[in-house]
């Protein structure tokens, strides 16, 4: 299970809309395993395939704490069927926007349908942190980042910072 490099803001790949998975097979399950390994290594609690450069509608989530047994979830072609009117606020971060966190308001619970890693149709009622993670990762599949849910001023500052970091890391840049 190789660790994959993460796509970092401002890479335009993060703004792509991911394509539906057409077949759940061994290579797709291998990709899910690689995504989990990458997420655990980062460390993080959720990862969308687009974050490792694979524009497929697949994501992984594991909310188990470090001292708990891992409880990985694989969601293929996830779709939000219902969102609660009640809202909740969580401080969100993203492996593709390292070291930046902001409070984001989202529906407090969601009902999601998806295929599991065996290709079986499943439904999940999620609330709390799982609901927030599902919405955050499904946003990735639609080219939406959590910073799109904060004020334009804050978002512009974050994007500017990451563009500067990317420029400073560009090949051929002299360090002196």
Swiss-Prot record:
GO terms for molecular function: metal ion binding; peptide deformylase activity. It holds the Pfam family Pep_deformylase. The active site is at residue 137. CDD domains: Pep_deformylase. Fe cation binds at residues 94, 136, 140. GO terms for biological process: co-translational protein modification; translation. SUPFAM superfamilies: Peptide deformylase (SSF56420). Keywords: Hydrolase, Iron, Metal-binding, Protein biosynthesis. Its EC number is 3.5.1.88. Binds 1 Fe(2+) ion. Its cofactor is Fe(2+). HAMAP family: Pep_deformylase (MF_00163). Removes the formyl group from the N-terminal Met of newly synthesized proteins. Requires at least a dipeptide for an efficient rate of reaction. N-terminal L-methionine is a prerequisite for activity but the enzyme has broad specificity at other positions. This is Peptide deformylase. It comes from Mesorhizobium japonicum (strain LMG 29417 / CECT 9101 / MAFF 303099) (Mesorhizobium loti (strain MAFF 303099)).
